């Protein structure tokens, strides 16, 4: 069956749960960009209420930290009502996807983009695909990417790998992302910590 599956509640990882990071990078607000990944109503709707609320709250804390520290904020969002050509192979795994209506497309209220934020149309798993994210980062002298959003083992992880592949240091915020299950979530953060990123918590970003 295509589409987002039914999601059962699970606890987000805490600092005590995180996998061991091979890299030893530190976030520098002068070098970083925050990526708010696919935090649209359509994608958040399947999440259990408590899980959704916690992820949105943590992402909003990071969003505020970015504003307070001069860190550019980038948003990915699918356009909705994609044509067959635009949808491509996505439809074989995820069906037709969201409609172009605000009920599907809007970023949730606590994370509403602000003037000056970078708004990127999302076409495939990676935030870098067919967007100017890399060019914007290079033009602004930024070589670190902090990632929050959904879904951890799909677009979030692929965007993390793509950042790494372009020599951008990714920081994956383990309690500001969500997934289809605890197992998918842990798979994503374990892969990231051992292969391409620093896995951290919201408190480590904002404190």
From Swiss-Prot:
GO terms for biological process: phenazine biosynthetic process. Pathway: Antibiotic biosynthesis; phenazine biosynthesis. Keywords: Antibiotic biosynthesis, Hydrolase, Virulence. InterPro entries: Isochorismatase (IPR016291), Isochorismatase-like_dom (IPR000868), Isochorismatase-like_hydrls (IPR050272), Isochorismatase-like_sf (IPR036380). Its EC number is 3.3.2.1. The keyword Hydrolase applies. It is an enzyme of class 3 (hydrolase). It catalyses: isochorismate + H2O = (2S,3S)-2,3-dihydroxy-2,3-dihydrobenzoate + pyruvate. GO terms for molecular function: isochorismatase activity. Disulfide bonds: none annotated. Gene3D superfamilies: Isochorismatase-like (3.40.50.850). Belongs to the isochorismatase family. Involved in the biosynthesis of the antibiotic phenazine, a nitrogen-containing heterocyclic molecule having important roles in virulence, competition and biological control. This isochorismatase may remove pyruvate from chorismate during the formation of the phenazine ring structure and/or stabilize the phenazine biosynthetic complex. This is Probable isochorismatase. It comes from Pseudomonas chlororaphis (Pseudomonas aureofaciens).
């Amino acid at each position: 069956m295509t589409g987002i599956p039914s999601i059962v509640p699970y606890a987000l990882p805490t600092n005590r749960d995180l996998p061991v990071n091979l890299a030893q990078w530190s976030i520098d607000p002068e070098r970083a960009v925050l990526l708010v990944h696919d935090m649209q109503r359509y994608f958040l709707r399947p999440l259990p209420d408590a899980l959704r609320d916690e992820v949105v709250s943590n992402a909003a804390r990071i969003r505020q930290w970015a504003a307070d520290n001069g860190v550019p904020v980038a948003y990915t969002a699918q356009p909705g009502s994609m044509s067959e050509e635009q949808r491509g192979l996505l439809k074989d795994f995820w069906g037709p996807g969201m409609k172009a209506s605000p009920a599907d497309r809007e970023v949730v209220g606590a994370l509403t983009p602000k003037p000056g934020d970078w708004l990127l149309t999302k076409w495939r798993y990676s935030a870098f695909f067919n967007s100017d994210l890399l060019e914007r980062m290079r033009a602004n002298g930024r070589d670190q990417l902090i990632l929050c959003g959904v879904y951890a083992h799909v677009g979030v992880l692929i965007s993390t790998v793509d950042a790494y592949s372009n020599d951008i240091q990714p920081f994956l915020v383990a309690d500001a992302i969500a997934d289809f299950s605890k197992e998918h979530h842990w798979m994503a953060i374990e892969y990231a910590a051992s292969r391409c990123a620093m896995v951290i918590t919201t408190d480590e970003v904002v404190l």
